[in-house]
């Protein structure tokens, strides 16, 4: 009898532990879901860590080929808010798959979007205005989606995120976190401006053209190796190298998710070191600061 009582107590304890692990505080549901890591940083700074934030695209994955799992779709359905750039293919598909359309917020609203991913043959200053609904076209449809790589665009995105969060959490006051974030983005803007004004050259070579908004903001020239997702021909590589030498380029940037074969060839012929960057890292302020240093100092 005593043995049976002990067994029942043990079963009850294990059951309680299992229930806690599955649905208790140990694994809280994410209240806000974001599409990519840099957006999580914005939300966490605004809410000062008071809200659980989940990210769809895992570290090291490419948003261009990403497709959410059924489990992630369940998390999206259970979240209060879904914040996206509004410019990547899978984000557009999400809008068609979720039940509550009002929970999905496009943070590109108000951003002056760049037409196309500029290659080495295109001027970085040509751009056009687009309405918010047009933001759902992915980059291969003619819109550069990398709006989180420039302080000036980040400020617009932060404002959009704050307004959406304030609307969905009317009893909470996140103004202090928002203002603190905006102050840091203003400081980052000033840092970038000063660094590029003091630089010997305003041109840089990059494998995948992810810095078009940064280039536009500070009068830089982005010379891209890849064009429309395709590796360049030998003739195009020669043109890139000639253009880079003519403009005194000191650095070649590449992202970890792209092949290094072409990067190494171009870097060797240019006589510069290839430097790895990660525009999708969680902290966009530190990421932009490091990219600015690499471009302006060439090392």
Predicted regions and their residues:
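Bacterial N-terminal signal peptides that target proteins for export
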Residues: 1-9
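Extracytoplasmic metal-acquisition and chelation regions
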Residues: 18-299
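Bacterial N-terminal signal peptides
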Residues: 9-20
